[in-house]
Amino acid sequence: MHTVVVGTSGTTAEDVVAVARHGARVELSAAAVEALAAARLIVDALAAKPEPVYGVSTGFGALASRHIGTELRAQLQRNIVRSHAAGMGPRVEREVVRALMFLRLKTVASGHTGVRPEVAQTMADVLNAGITPVVHEYGSLGCSGDLAPLSHCALTLMGEGEAEGPDGTVRPAGELLAAHGIAPVELREKEGLALLNGTDGMLGMLVMALADLRNLYTSADITAALSLEALLGTDKVLAPELHAIRPHPGQGVSADNMSRVLAGSGLTGHHQDDAPRVQDAYSVRCAPQVNGAGRDTLDHAALVAGRELASSVDNPVVLPDGRVESNGNFHGAPVAYVLDFLAIVAADLGSICERRTDRLLDKNRSHGLPPFLADDAGVDSGLMIAQYTQAALVSEMKRLAVPASADSIPSSAMQEDHVSMGWSAARKLRTAVDNLARIVAVELYAATRAIELRAAEGLTPAPASEAVVAALRAAGAEGPGPDRFLAPDLAAADTFVREGRLVAAVEPVTGPLA
């Protein structure tokens, strides 16, 4: 099994996905252990002084003015974890919790938090044992980090609360730790706070959303090309010289992807004799512009994610010169904004996919295709209701595009009077990405059926299109014919898209797509 080494200088998106989704093991580097030990010496020295230091010898938030004596400091650290583990609602997904834990370990290992090496090692041990703390949907305002979600994870390190074992069974955390030979941690000065104070939940969800959206944007370039072909549209609008004079990078990439898919097609430009078209509809003609703008947004979000992955988010932080300073780096605004931006572009991508699907099904706009791509229209309804499902998904995505980060509710007696709502932005983006895969799948299913109907008329689809049709049919999504139970076909198309098999089906013909 792949092992991810956690050092002092952050991590990569690829490592987050490897740990969160694929169960990669984690290991602390020697440099990380050294940095942890050095920072802990600084915290211990400060703890021995009479002056109050936030997070070391004071209360938290609005209670920071209370100086805590040495005899109560271990209790203080336990109490912050217990009291802040106040999440409610459904459990969040295992991969989200694993990303959250791994990213907190990444920050702890930087040597800027003052956590002891043995606590960091326990964090790694819990991940490697496949133990997943029970974390709830609601509880984070995305400022002072994802406090409640991280608190539930810290509670597991203490042997308290509930967690899911590698077999999927939820048990008391103490039992699971004992079963895997892991001793619960006894928190000391600053450690409880350091385990809670980060943007790790929203960042982990951003990283995984980007991985999914990269696949979906390439998939949507393919389905746009298939729809253009099925509608007998022109591929002249994809010419490189047209996109060079408006040089948005993503636009050129999407146009190139579509051109590669359509190479060798006998359908493009094959207009009806009685209704020649000078221009195709916007949803067909402007696909590179819309898809490409979304691609550029992904690149911007990835830039923000990369910076955050290289960051050490805590408050206070331990600096190399020995100072321990309060700061505002826990504010989730940078991550929250791009999470909301991605929800907007995902909604618009879903919208343009649905518009092309509707055009394929409308006999007045499909240029010779049967109504709803039905076998015997009237007796058969064809894909009529598949578009209803797609429209319902698009409608929800438009609601999910409303920014969470534009909201802020003051908390902690107005000490924390502006928050990012980044966790909420991340949660709704996960739903949006999930919906987008289904929307792309419906367009794929409709476009491949339409292409098969064109082929039955004697027209020759592009080799890449033929490869997609063959692969999708082999995956269990059947082709044209009388009405049948449609949900299994749509589910097969959905899985085909999500697993990257659509992209994999065309690349042997087109070469690698971006």
Curated annotation (Swiss-Prot):
Modification 2,3-didehydroalanine (Ser) occurs at: S144
PTM field: Contains an active site 4-methylidene-imidazol-5-one (MIO), which is formed autocatalytically by cyclization and dehydration of residues Cys-Ser-Gly.
Catalytic function, reaction form: L-histidine = trans-urocanate + NH4(+)
Pathway annotation: Amino-acid degradation; L-histidine degradation into L-glutamate; N-formimidoyl-L-glutamate from L-histidine: step 1/3
GO CC list: cytoplasm
Localization in the cell: Cytoplasm
BP GO annotations: L-histidine catabolic process to glutamate and formamide; L-histidine catabolic process to glutamate and formate
Pfam families linked to this entry: Lyase_aromatic
EC number: 4.3.1.3
Similarity comment: Belongs to the PAL/histidase family.
Protein name: Histidine ammonia-lyase
Source organism per UniProt: Streptomyces griseus
Highest classification ranks of the organism: Bacteria, Bacillati, Actinomycetota, Actinomycetes, Kitasatosporales
Gene name in the database record: hutH
